[in-house]
Amino acid sequence: MNIAMNPTAYLIAAPLLALLVFSPLKHDSSGDQPKVRQAAVAGSFYPADPKELSAMIDDLLAKAQGPQISEPIIAAVAPHAGYVYSGPVAAYTYAQLKGHKYSRVVLIAPTHYVGFDFTSVYDGDAYTTPLGQVPIDKEFARRLVKMSSTMQLSDKGHQATSDAPEHSVEVQLPWLQKVLGNFELVPIVMGDTSYESSRALGVALAKILRDDHNTLVLASSDLSHYHPYDDAVKIDHKTLNALQAWDYFSMSRNFQWRGPGQPGIWEACGGAPIVAAMIYAERMGANQARVLKYANSGDITGDHSRVVGYSADVFVKAESSKTVDAPFSLTVEEKSNLLALARKSVEYVVQQRYPYEPPASASSSLNQERGAFTTLKEAGELRGCIGYTSAVKPLYITVRDTATLAATQDPRFPQVTASELPKLEYEISVLSPLRRVTDVQQIVVGQHGLLMKNGDSEGLLLPQVPVEQQWDRHTFLEQTCRKAGMRSDCWMDEDTDIFSFTAVVFGERDVHREADNTK
């Protein structure tokens, strides 16, 4: 979350904080005095006694039972709440890392208390925990910040006080000390949570570490915050479904936290660090996301009224790049129902001047959360087209929304009038998750749609467009660039991301033909 959390609110996840007095960090910047970040949450989030802390981690690791991953682990995610709450989940990440010989850890974390608008790479010499000091790889840090103006050497987000006991980096360190032994640390706290900042960090890390096999990139993040148990599970599984589908672009634009009891679309306080880690991992050859363990604080305490979600995840380089996104299909009846809903939604908003409220759908497919576009045509010509690229609402609600918006909010056209309603033809495109294109030769005209993004410029073309226009792959790429308001050769720019997707596309004529064929 790109906000400074209220320290009192965080007591839900770590009630022991209310009983503790924190000492401000000691720092003497004069002369050659090392700049060492002292432990701020030892004794609250985890034991301050080294022996007790070591024994607790050993016990949690021993209980983290699961098959050992054989593929190379390129990056990972671990939660950062108090060990009594998130430790049983975090242990699953660290159990997989045990025995690996990483000499450097790049630890990417969110800020909970201090607001700033850049990515803060720690400018000090060490972090300290009850298990000892962890030295900073200062040369790596200096190289990294030179890669992008979004990054700075700074102690913003790293320093802690009694009023702002930042913990998102610190909580991970005793785990790393136990499972890796000696290593150098590059601690990073992200104040700017935009996709551009996550991309800049992920790409920069991949460039520096291109031939490095001894560095671990770790994202520090919890999931949803302070919702009733059942709501939290639903929100968290949306996030984890997108993670496993490798749709980090949709994750980045849909992470949000509105406040206690107000569910966001997807939630993770370390959403930007997760996205940065995925972008890095992808460019290093990772092609699968594995969720090792999910739970929330209610599973530990038994209090289901307001919980915090946790997951342990790794990004691996597997022989097969197959994601867990299941094939999606619709029956003729479901397609017909969606088209009827689109027409009803447009007619209702044009005639009544407010959105149609459809009855709940009994179809499991129509209740799946899916991205979709609704296209309106009149006499064969485009009359409006708007959609959601991300799976943020049940499909039938997405169709209601996008049909309504296509008729009333498409900036290329005036609003649909009542006299046009009988002339409109409807087409719906139900989208798969987005996946970045690493080789344009893999783009299949008629199968893939494209989304092109470079900075603030962004444009999308559906899979049916190049077929209708009789374009080849090269022209399809150029036209998507132009749709984004960029040069026609923007797709060759290393700063341009190309995302592809597939779609289930159907119009009223298609459904009538399909229905006739089944008789």
Across the structure, where does each feature detected by a protein language model lie?
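N-terminal secretory signal peptides that target proteins for export/translocation
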Residues: 1-5
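Bacterial Sec-dependent signal peptides at the C-terminal "C-region" and cleavage site
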Residues: 7-8, 12-34
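Active-site histidine-anchored catalytic micro-motif
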Residues: 32-279, 283-285, 294-301
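Short glycine-rich loop/turn motifs
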Residues: 73-74, 170-173, 310, 369-374
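Conserved hydrophobic/aromatic beta-strand scaffold that supports enzyme active sites
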Residues: 175, 187, 310-312, 498-500
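Short helix-capping/linker segments at secondary-structure and domain boundaries
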Residues: 180-184, 279-290, 321, 353, ...
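Long, Lys/Arg- and hydrophobic-enriched amphipathic alpha-helices
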Residues: 286, 291-324
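Basic nucleic-acid-binding interfaces
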Residues: 322-519
